[in-house]
């Protein structure tokens, strides 16, 4: 029984010892900076050498002026980097002692670097791959960095075998930067990502700029093509107008070659026809009284169309100037930035304006043609010229004014002339001779009708600044195709005394026949002018 008790007591003692030893192994031991001075004497000595090198006045503490001078002279730092390191080194303490410097190094992350991290720092940041093998062989970690940075240490020469003073100085400065101010990762991923994003954004902006510039160039080319088409239409319109003027001139020249005999016969026939119309009709003077009103209406309508055409030419000139300004502004930096940002461009307004101008010119051209056809038809129905006055304008106006504004006087005179024809056969011939005016030379046988707009408009060309004056010179011989038998019967009837009245009554329908022949003539002329 006593032996069993001893065995149990020995077993319990062994378990207690094992538990106590296990607790000691897993316990986390905290080492202070003061204790670390004793454990890492060489590191503390290196920190003290660095502090002594920075303390110029040997007061036992490093102020801001001393740290600034050390960074400028020994570490060759300038600008914002020096300011950043100075603020990190001092913080809120303007006097840094040896213990402060040792505690800052003791609590730094760089002191816990492993051998692999130290080798990576030597390769990537210091760029000294030649000493990597020696560092790996000696299994050096981050605690050795103060000895690298110490100005009085022979560790670099003796332990690592660095013979080059340039390499030693390079390693010393980099180690001093890490010990005093901490490690700064130059390969900042955030910066790389930001730079990549900016590069992508710049590439996208350049692509959009090129795309918008191509679209703008394409739109300008389209506008230029449309403007060229508009100019072609203008040229065609002017050519047609010129052809029309040439045709009118040719007709006036061809009609002006009428000989002296035909002109005399024409005047005699007109005189006789008007006498018969006044003697044998009651209240039939309305068509002749309507003639000046219709002519005035025709002139006003043609002047309005001419005004519309001049306005169209003016807007066409403004469109050309706008396209020229758009082409000049295309190469400017401001225009390129507007195109890149997708701002509204004025080219859409120019495009719509050119389309509206084109449609308006076509409408004016169609309306002008329809107006000419309509007035030619009115001429055919009325039997007197309205659109283009001929050489008989003065005769017709004098007849209309004398017979309708002095109706009572002329009515009595015409009836007296007929009664005198019964008693005096030669009276008719004398009246005919008195009213026949001298023949008009061929050069003066045409009358000109000028359509002048009420307001001066600028045309599309610089030489068209004067108002457009359109000379219309087409002579109309109302009785060119009258038969010789009708003329002879009128003249013979006037010379036969008592038979003159019967002859006049027999030829009573000559003036309506004259109107019918004039209608066919006007229709043929209207078809040709169109």
UniProtKB/Swiss-Prot annotation:
Its main location: membrane. It is a single-pass type I membrane protein. The chain crosses the membrane at residues 190-210. Disruption phenotype: Sterility due to dysfunction of somatic cells. Affects the store-operated Ca(2+) (SOC) activity. Residues 409-447 are annotated as: Disordered. Residues 411-424 have a biased composition (Low complexity). GO terms for cellular component: cytoplasm; dendrite; endoplasmic reticulum; intracellular organelle; neuronal cell body; plasma membrane. Residues 113-181 form the SAM domain. GO terms for molecular function: calcium channel activity; calcium channel regulator activity; calcium ion binding; identical protein binding. Pfam families: SAM_2, SOAR. Ca(2+) binds at residues 55, 57, 59, 61, 66. InterPro entries: SAM, SAM/pointed_sf, SOAR, STIM. It comes from the Eukaryota. The keyword Aminoacyl-tRNA synthetase does not apply. Changing residue 55 to A: Sterility along with defects in ovulation, slow growth and stunted gonad development; pBoc arrhythmia and fluid accumulation in the pseudocoel. Residues 42-77 form the EF-hand domain. It is found in: Membrane. Coexpressed with orai-1 in spermatheca, gonad sheath cells and intestine. Also detected in neurons in the head and in the uterine epithelial cells. Heterogeneously expressed in the intestine with strong presence in the anterior and posterior intestine and weaker in the midsection. Residues 1-22 form the signal peptide. Homodimer. Interacts with orai-1. This is Stromal interaction molecule 1.
């Amino acid at each position: 029984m006593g032996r069993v008790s001893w065995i149990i007591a020995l077993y319990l003692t062994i378990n207690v010892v094992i538990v106590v030893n296990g607790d000691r192994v897993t316990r986390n031991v905290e080492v202070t900076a003061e204790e670390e001075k004793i454990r890492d004497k060489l590191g503390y000595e290196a920190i003290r050498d660095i502090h002594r090198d920075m303390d110029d006045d040997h007061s036992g503490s490093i102020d801001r002026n001393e740290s600034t001078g050390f960074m400028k002279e020994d570490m060759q730092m300038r600008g914002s980097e020096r300011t950043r390191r100075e603020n990190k080194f001092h913080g809120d303490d303007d006097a840094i002692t040896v213990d402060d410097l040792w505690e800052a190094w003791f609590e730094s992350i760089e002191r816990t670097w492993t051998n692999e991290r130290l080798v990576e720092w030597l390769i990537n940041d210091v760029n000294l791959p030649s000493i990597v093998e020696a560092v790996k062989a000696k299994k050096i970690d981050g605690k050795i960095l103060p000895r690298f940075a110490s100005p009085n240490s022979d560790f670099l020469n003796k332990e690592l075998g660095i013979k080059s003073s340039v390499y030693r100085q390079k390693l010393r400065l980099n180690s001093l930067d890490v010990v005093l101010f901490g490690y700064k990762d130059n390969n900042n991923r955030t910066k790389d990502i930001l730079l990549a994003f900016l590069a992508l954004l710049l590439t996208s902006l350049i692509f959009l700029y090129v795309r918008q510039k191509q679209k703008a160039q394409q739109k300008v080319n389209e506008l230029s093509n449309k403007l060229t088409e508009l100019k072609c239409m203008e040229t065609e319109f002017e050519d047609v107008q010129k052809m029309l003027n040439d045709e009118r001139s040719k007709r006036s020249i061809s009609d002006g070659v009428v000989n002296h005999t035909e002109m005399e016969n024409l005047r005699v026939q007109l005189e006789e026809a008007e006498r018969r119309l006044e003697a044998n009709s009651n209240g039939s003077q309305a068509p002749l009284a309507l003639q000046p009103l219709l002519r005035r209406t025709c002139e006003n309508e043609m002047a309005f169309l001419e005004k519309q055409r001049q306005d169209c030419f003016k807007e066409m000139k403004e469109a050309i100037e706008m396209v020229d300004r758009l082409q000049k502004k295309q190469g400017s930096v401001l225009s390129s930035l507007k195109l890149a940002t997708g701002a509204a461009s004025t080219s859409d307004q120019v495009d719509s304006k050119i389309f509206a101008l084109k449609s308006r010119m076509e409408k004016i051209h169609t309306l002008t043609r329809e107006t000419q056809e309509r007035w030619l038809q009115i001429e055919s129905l009325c039997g007197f010229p309205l659109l283009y006055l001929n050489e008989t304008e003065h005769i017709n106006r004098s007849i209309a004014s004398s017979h309708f504004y002095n109706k009572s006087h002329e009515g009595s005179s015409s009836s007296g002339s007929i009664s005198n024809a019964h008693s005096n056969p030669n009276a008719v011939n004398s009246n005919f001779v008195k009213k026949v005016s001298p023949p008009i030379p061929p050069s003066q046988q045409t009358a000109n009708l000028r359509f002048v707009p009420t307001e001066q408009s600028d045309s599309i060309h610089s030489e068209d600044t004067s108002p457009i004056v359109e000379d219309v010179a087409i002579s109309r011989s109302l009785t060119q195709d009258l038969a010789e038998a009708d003329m002879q019967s009128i003249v013979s009837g006037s010379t036969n005394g008592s038979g003159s009245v019967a002859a006049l009554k027999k030829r009573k329908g000559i003036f309506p026949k004259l109107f019918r022949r004039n209608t066919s003539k006007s229709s043929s002329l209207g078809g040709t002018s169109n």
